[in-house]
């Protein structure tokens, strides 16, 4: 079904894959690297003149309503006067959260006023989810788009799209660049044709299951090529493509064909089509060979999209597999709540409590059509099981309504909702306690569906394709593979109508900036002042997390908490609240120590500094010139969302560093850097504990020599001082200065002086 090459490969024009060690052609590997689609797009957007060290200018930007407020505030504080490139502000994340009174609506009005003031594009609530709007109206062949959402992926249309934290978008708004080393490029070589009952989520989950745990494509570009591409509709490709984020890849791109041309022309943008193919001989750093005809209906069980099984395999081994998930749930809940699954097995079938088809992965036209085909004339039943369907945009919704598909779904008992990303991150349709929800959405991290373990609640999500979800719904909630039905061939041609966008979307980039005032609600606050880095620092260990991976959902919860993202200090109260509830108070206490230092008082750390002065070479350290900050240790932090708040929330309550064995994603590490924190790493198992201090002398010099090791000294409460070895991976010159300045905002202010 899926095979991974052990080394690099050459791809010939006849689709022959040649292992690097067996290649005998004349072209050199370095020259053949230029034959990938990724090279052609990156080179056309690179401004550095050096393809090893890229400085990328994007064609457009995209943000939604739980990220754009902070981005605009940061850019404004950094001197921005107008949006220099098309910037789309959508309102698809907190648009249904009944949290905090007016705060969500206030964010939306702020977004509209920002689009009017600076010349942006504003998509009101319920009109479209961010990535469907970008597909329909912005993406095209050979383009690059940067979004403040990790699922920013438009590769099937020939666009290399990247999800990053808000700081990287701010740089583009200030006419700066996205700076990275040239990434590895991995071919995803598709052959065959999927069975009619196999959908895009099945293909995506199979790939994720094969590459996530071994890091095969981490921070690399996935380039989809091969004869199997032409067997897939553009809708199908889009739904596979958006899930590549869950592999931890950097970006994605597909070869394009007349099918893509027709799709863009249908949306009134045929001129944005560009035929993209690898050169006759192209070199890839790896190859994922996918036989589409061998893919079966899949399920990703809690608590990660990589926890993948064939549905048939699960149904044949329910007891063993479900017990493994129950054991994992006990670890995830830390004894605060319980999830039981074996009690949901009735007569040898797993009974689920909810089905959801939504968002940029599930809510697309063909997925909803498939669900309707399975449910036409059927019933979801009148027990606990329920089904909700969220079309991904109003144009999609409108065509489904015109074709009678909405009526078919409603008649079967499904609930039809507007374009909303809530089920993807816990802001809508939270299941019942101890419930299992099957969803065609993007993620199934712990508690991302909205449950609150601190309140004794635990529910979970399994990811599936819309086809198998609909088959399950037609079977009253008993887990059913789409292969058990034969109803998948009737897919009427989609008719796109731009009228909802013409009537509701504010096109400020065309109209230009008006310089009218921004409209602030009472919850929208400016970023607090942050201090610059000193030569020597003291870190207090405020959290130590030894889980294999720490997600951004654990660092700062999603769901209703997201509504507070316009208030940096208010949101920070929720930092690590589900994983380490004592962290916030410990970090705030450390921040108070720093405030006292700035006021000339370090008396509370007299003993700590006395022990530091006993370290050879540190006898003359000045405590008043030594910054004090909190630190989080995690083995592998940052899997998941691009949200900059995963880092900023630590920073605004005293955070000064992370220490990790490795960082799960480039985007989280960038967020740490842009918020003025040190992205420290250590190979050894940490011996420090929460409450210990770590003294690091000469940290500015260490910043100027990334990749080299340097010493830290652990000040234990009741033990001798011990040495640890730290390092930082590659940092650009600008990133080093951002950390020294204390934040991206400070760095930009310094440049204006």
From Swiss-Prot:
GO molecular function: 4 iron, 4 sulfur cluster binding; aconitate hydratase activity; metal ion binding
Binding site for [4Fe-4S] cluster: 360, 421, 424
Listed cofactors: [4Fe-4S] cluster
Keywords from the UniProt entry: Iron, Iron-sulfur, Metal-binding
Entry-linked Gene3D superfamilies: Aconitase, Domain 2, Aconitase, domain 3, Aconitase, domain 4
Free-text cofactor note: Binds 1 [4Fe-4S] cluster per subunit.
InterPro entries: Acnase/IPM_dHydase_lsu_aba_1/3, Acoase/IPM_deHydtase_lsu_aba, Aconitase/3IPM_dehydase_swvl, Aconitase/IPM_isomerase, Aconitase_4Fe-4S_dom, Aconitase_dom2, AconitaseA/IPMdHydase_ssu_swvl
Family in the record: Belongs to the aconitase/IPM isomerase family.
Name of this protein: Uncharacterized protein YbhJ
Gene this protein is translated from: ybhJ
